[in-house]
Every structure is written in C-alpha cells, then in structure tokens.
C-alpha cells in the first residue's frame, strides 16, 4: 500500500497498475480534485469525457462509472463512492479562465492547468496532452437551459472515492488551488491518495508526505 498526503494547491501523479485500487480521501471536506488518466504505456490513449458521458448516458460519475479512453476502452472503474456524484464538465481552472471570470488581478494566482503542465512534464506530457478532466468532489449542477454552476461541494471530511485500474494507467492530479469560487470552500485543503492491491511490478509515485508499505518508488515533491 502507498499513501500520499497531497498538500493544498499541489500536484500528484502515479502509475496505478491493472487490478490496483486508487482511493482519494477528502481529508477536510469540500475540496475539488482535478484528475487526468492516461494509458501508462501509450499516453496518446487517454481519458475521454465524451466517450465516458455517452456510454453511461449521464454527466456525473459515481459507483459503477467506467472511465473510457478516446479509443472507447476502459481505463478505470469507480468501485466505491461515498459522495454520490462527481463532475465531468466543469474543466480545470487556468490563468486565462480566472482572468475572464474574476478579473485580471487573478492572473498571478496558481491554477490547475499549471499543476497539470508541471506534473505532466515529469512524464513527457505537454499542453497538447491536456484534455477535458474529471473533477472529483466538485459540485457542478446543470440547469434545464444548459447553464452550469460551480456551487458548494457535496463532500464532507473523510469521504472517499475509489477507482480500480483496468489496465496500467498514469494518473495526474491537481489538488485544486481555486479561491475565487466555492468549489473548495474558498480555502483549498489537503487530500490523501492511497494505492492498494498486489501486482507484479512497482508503481512510480510523485507527491508529498508519501508512506510506502509495498513495492513502490516515490520521487519529487509533486508541487508546481
């Protein structure tokens, strides 16, 4: 088992081997966790929001949801969810979207796209590899007219969501630094990432405060 506490505003990444389970714990409640998933052996195969949404007939993820790739193949399956629903359409905050929504004074604020680019670079990924992401714990209701809202989260301290890897996958996470809307309760906090399960090869994890009790390699601080 490998457990990593990811500080507020920080990034994290790990290879999760086929059959292993990744559990995300919202330690303090109301913390959005932006997430991207790639085939660990061919990163051109990556999470596809359109394929996933179309296959399950809905925009929210919960127990039983299968994260599909751009080749319509399964990457991970949500096997347990204590929250009830997670967002697929709200996207990742960026300097550009922050200035558009909240004013140019927010330009210097750290954003999820910064985290994804910095953490992705550890694995040879760049801007062209960023796709529409998952927002675990984020509450983005959609009105009948198609209007999206970013509102107070549904999570509470200690609630978890668990995903089983259906193949070897690379998971990138941005522990969302947003302070201009209520997706993090205006105060980003730490989350915990735990990988469990027995495989024949070791996982490679980058993050912070990592405790390893099985074959795994921890490198870097994982912050952007």
List the predicted regions and their residue ranges.
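Extracellular mucin-like PTS domains
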Residues: 204-219
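Acidic, Ser/Thr/Pro
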Residues: 1-207, 224
